UniProtKB/Swiss-Prot annotation:
This is Orotidine 5'-phosphate decarboxylase. HAMAP family: OMPdecase_type1_B (MF_01200_B). The keyword Nucleotide-binding does not apply. The keyword Lyase applies. The gene is pyrF. It catalyses: orotidine 5'-phosphate + H(+) = UMP + CO2. Homodimer. The active site is at K67 (proton donor).
Amino acid sequence: MPESADPRDRLIVALDLPDVEAAERLVARIGDAATFYKIGYRLAYAGGLDFAARLAKSGKKTFLDLKLHDIGNTVEEGVRSASALGATFLTVHAYPQTMRAAVRGRGPGLKILAVTVLTSYDDADAAEAGYALPIADLVARRAEQAAEIGIDGIVCSAVEAGAVRHRIGPSGLIVTPGIRPAGAEAGDQKRVMTPGQARAAGIDHVVVGRPITGADDPRAVAQRIVAEMEDA
């Protein structure tokens, strides 16, 4: 399991906010309590990619959660563009052709993460979407394919982390959304753990959004999460 020199890197704050101004305010309030930020669709479509580049230039790490999935050439060129923004992580959907294209486009310093199954899904959702396998088996199969292709890490729920680690080995990254501090509401996440449980399960990075972004004191919440993982 890869270790970061800075324990704060294990926490990725999800900037699921409506505009860049709100994101800038939150980053300023958190200060040095966090070093790693995720930009997803909502912020990306509101100027968030330029903001991500500025964050990277300021010394922060950025995770572009864009979940690319398209024809190979489009994915490959999209990954090259993300590399130019100074991103640390970029997500693609864990389909073999998509993952191979992403590996071809990967530049220095960028790590590609494959999204296995969204953490808002349970087995009933997967069945409704037409998948024949239960989620645990689907995640394991996609993780194994990702490792064979050369993907840097896997995005999965904490519940599947052990099975994923078995398939990607000790050097692969496991990044987990759906993390909620003790006492926080699960929201639309269906497969959740606390930060301490996630760290004990061998997860490298946890993604936390609303418990931080909606807090009266987001800096303090970020500090507590980092401390909880340190103590696990």
